[in-house]
Amino acid sequence: MVRIMLMHAVRAWRSADDFPCTEHMAYKIAQVAADPVDVDPEVADMVCNRIIDNAAVSAASMVRRPVTVARHQALAHPVRHGAKVFGVEGSYSADWAAWANGVAARELDFHDTFLAADYSHPADNIPPLVAVAQQLGVCGAELIRGLVTAYEIHIDLTRGICLHEHKIDHVAHLGPAVAAGIGTMLRLDQETIYHAIGQALHLTTSTRQSRKGAISSWKAFAPAHAGKVGIEAVDRAMRGEGSPAPIWEGEDGVIAWLLAGPEHTYRVPLPAPGEPKRAILDSYTKQHSAEYQSQAPIDLACRLRERIGDLDQIASIVLHTSHHTHVVIGTGSGDPQKFDPDASRETLDHSLPYIFAVALQDGCWHHERSYAPERARRSDTVALWHKISTVEDPEWTRRYHCADPAKKAFGARAEVTLHSGEVIVDELAVADAHPLGTRPFERKQYVEKFTELADGVVEPVEQQRFLAVVESLADLESGAVGGLNVLVDPRVLDKAPVIPPGIFR
């Protein structure tokens, strides 16, 4: 289907310039959010897939420390008519439920992605919108509408504005998307959505140090924080509060001081009035628990190991890939931590040399076993790991940024040099699970991912109840969206780490 997208020029303006509110980027996004277009059936189906996907990775992360911390914080904020915290009974303040559920969905780096000018994980919009829907008794159809908008705005901003070039974390696109999505879901007026978007962006701009060097657990908290901030921004705007404006284009705004500066013009595509919002269909989930740009290399490594045979005969491996892959998870980052056997899990899942080495040795990837400290410290793994490097290839960079989804690629070409001098070469453009891959994810694969990761965590009866609720999401009446919560076996939660008390109790 050909989409009618309007390309908006976005640049900095001086305060003295004649720049009416209706030309502000936040206003144009609010127009899209307030446009009551119908949701295409395949788009609604994909929303359900991504809700299942988030539940899968949330179940797998339930007893990890960051998730346990966030859950404890949320449980300190019970309310009578609130939202659900993943895994447990009770009713809690929507902002804190979104916080806990956002950390659970993001902790394992295992849900959906969209890559273009910048990076994004648009399923990070799901926890805050579901939490607000649960607290306010929103019906399933309106939740779907809101999520479709959130995905659209998040992906369109990611297409048009590069944040990482200026060392700004990609959650700066998430905050406005959450605000816009909630605005659609609650059918708020355009002015209210405009101010909510401005506040959300203003408060979710932070540096990329969260994904550089020794990466900490904040990587999982960052999108949850943006979601929480987005909820609070909408709440204030609904009560009549305004926002810094123009937030992107102002003389002291985001573009002028945090991004490319007053001389640069960004071009952001947005749906034309009356145009269905379909951007979610351009995003893709993960089969492997690791940074998305390592998905195709993992599949490539699993394929290559049979051709190589004795891995001890490897002298070197060079992965030719895109600029983004090279500098974010490859040796172009200059991060020595990416070669440290004692590095955190968060650091290792952003180390393509480590990931490729383990996938090559094991022929598979596991969200826990592949990151185990004893796995990372294996002497043969460390030896192989240090033989792997990345280089930027202009052709892979071009394909990474290609506007044609059929030609867009996030893979690599591997050149494996053996001690004998023989060179083995293979390449893979997209991951097997990608829509254009050899085993693309459809509903069946999303359900299989959920049942696999929920095994031993969620009782089978509860798994089936949850899946049935998701299947009927579009028909859920007001108050029934609480059924999207998944209850976890209490014996599993008993295995969670003991967390020292904080301020919230």
Curated annotation (Swiss-Prot):
Keyword Membrane: no
Induction: By propionate, but not by glucose.
Phenotype of null mutants: Cells lacking both prpC and prpD are unable to grow on propionate media in vitro or in murine bone marrow-derived macrophages infected ex vivo. Paradoxically, bacterial growth and persistence, and tissue pathology, are indistinguishable in mice infected with wild-type.
Lyase found in the keyword field: yes
Alphabetical list of InterPro entries matching this protein: 2-Methylcitrate_Dehydratase (IPR053420), MmgE/PrpD_sf (IPR036148), MmgE/PrpD_sf_1 (IPR042183), MmgE/PrpD_sf_2 (IPR042188), MmgE_PrpD (IPR005656), MmgE_PrpD_C (IPR045337), MmgE_PrpD_N (IPR045336)
Family membership: Belongs to the PrpD family.
Quaternary structure, from the entry: Monomer.
Protein name stated in the entry: 2-methylcitrate dehydratase
Protein source organism: Mycobacterium tuberculosis (strain ATCC 35801 / TMC 107 / Erdman)
